[in-house]
Amino acid sequence: MGIRFRVTGAALALTALLAQAASAQDSPQDGKLILPTIDVSSSRLGAGIVGTSTSVITAEDIRRAPAQTLPDILSREPGIQVTNLFGGVNGARSAVDMRGFGAAAGSNTLILIDGRRITDLDLTGVDLASIPRESIERIEITRGNSGVVLYGDGAVGGVINIVTKSAAGSPPSARVETGFGSFKQREGAASAGGSNGPWSASLYGNGVNSDGYRVNNFYRQANGTGDFRYTVPDGSFYLKLSGDGQYIGLPGARRVDPVAGLDQLTTDRTGATTPYDHSQKDGANATAGITRLLAPGAELIVDGGIRYKREQAQFYNATATVATSDPNKAVDTMLTTTSFTPRVKLDSLFGTLPWNAIGGIDYYRAVYGSDRPLYLGAPPIDRYDLTQSSLGLYWQQTLSVLPSTDISAGGRIQRVTVSARDKFDINAPGGQQCFIDFGCFPANVEGLPFDTTETHRAFHLGLDQRFNENIAVFGRWAESFRVPNVDERVGVVTVGNGVPTTFDLRTQRSHDWEAGTRLHFGRLDIQSSIYDMMLTDEIHFRYGPNFEANNINLDPTRRYGNETIASYRVSDELRFKAGAAYTRSVFRQGLFAGNDVPLVSRWTGNAGVSWNIWQKWLVFDGVVRLVGSRRMDNDQTNVQPKIPASTTVDVRLGGEIEKIFWSFAIQNLLNVSYFDYAIASPYPYGPGSQLNTYNAYPLQGRSYMLKVGMTY
């Protein structure tokens, strides 16, 4: 865990140094704070992907949000649903789902930082808790398949691009903040930045400690990022560094079993099934690049990066005690991803018609090594090694055929090479299973070597038509794909059933279309769209009868729905914002044809208000969020109980007095008892039926957070 504390300590130290020379930033005139505008009235050449449904969350939106985590902030956007397994502490390990992919959400929503993909090829996904909130300039959300051309595989439900701040051209500044909240949560954050001529630097660090809502729900997190730049009129050089560390308790589920008379959601909601399980994750990232203006309207960007992540987890049997450990299994995984992504941006005229384009090459190489011992430090029972390389070539062009009409077209071709191996050691602790009177048997079978090379293609076609300053329409058609991740490949067979893993899954493919409108009438802005997505070979985890537990390619599936977002500005001091989404995720062929895909709510919505009560000295923000009922994980038959619908209210009061700022937030104001993830028993039929039996992961009730800080 050393890296995370060293990174945060360095950030705090630099903050103190820069603060001595920092100058106070200008305050709004007469202390008046004006709410930022929301622009959904037009699509401009070079702003986003033409024809797509997009939205932007600004730094001010993040700072004023009553929600305390990035996943919760994202869940306010129509079409985005969030699943939490660990009590929702700081959003750790939360899955962000765009357009209804349920348990596979993390592999179908592509996460970027500054336009570079950070979604790894394992199932842990992107942990948004590792990103300091204060480092974020804005979050750009692009829905649907169209992001695959620019950013590559995995952009099926959509793309979330987190754009970070730069200190280029800025005076010296610094910010420190501390917070205290429910469940003994303590937070600290610091940032500093500034520039001197062409040189600039900025640092952000934060740390969070919490005991969590449940037993064995403790959480320790520290993050640090740095941005260093040299900028001149015709180019720049930049270096970005980050490090994060996390240590978290894994309390397990609360079981409901009517036959056994068990309802832990009611009798022991905050208890732990696994009071000693825990996980530790450490990561480090570096990106360096140059930009060069080749000619007016022609810019070259050449950058590359390396990401390293190590995760260790220890799991114990139910008989474990403090005095006598009884290990069940452990995981020790290292993943290193290197990338090289040169590209060119062009902006010119075709006759009298403005056009722009972006094209380039993406090269990524990921090396994965995972030991699966009985306990950490022991020789591994299985050692999985996988190397995946991808080389993509893409081009996307936008043309303004009329002052009111933009069209866009793009394509990508990507070659993916995968090599996977499994080494099984029968002599390792836990490598054999022994039974009285029957002898000992291997706990697993060594997997078969796997090597494959595939070529995949994707495209995007888009149109934006602005009829006048009040009404615009947009539409698009796209094809996307998703390559199986390493954990899905490892799990194509049930561990311990005597069948070797083959690592072989088919690549998931998707086609979708979307059409929508943007309306702007005075103080009212509305964006609404409908979409339809057809998928083949969708990758899904199945836990079925006869102790089957493996990843498979599903029969064809479909997503369709509507997403609407609206904002009404009453005045510079008062604004209302609301959103609603209807999301259908269904099997369209096979045994479950017509059934809902689990973990997807059909209806979601939210309404919020931002009110500057007394200029900038006292401001109020409130959000009401509705999440409809959804099928539990593993309930493809659609016969088990649903995860109940929930309505939660979050509120925040805050303000600024010269250099001092403060806030007091309450999450789940009405103290609603709810959960957003549960897994149903695979035995709903026949003798010994476990209908209405499931494991749920409850989320915290009413909680508080008080923060105070200072800017320099």
What is each of the regions a protein language model found here?
Residues 116-144, 162-163:
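Short acidic/polar hinge/loop motifs at secondary-structure boundaries
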Residues 299-317, 466, 472-478, 482-484, ...:
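Membrane-embedded beta-barrel scaffold of Gram-negative outer-membrane proteins
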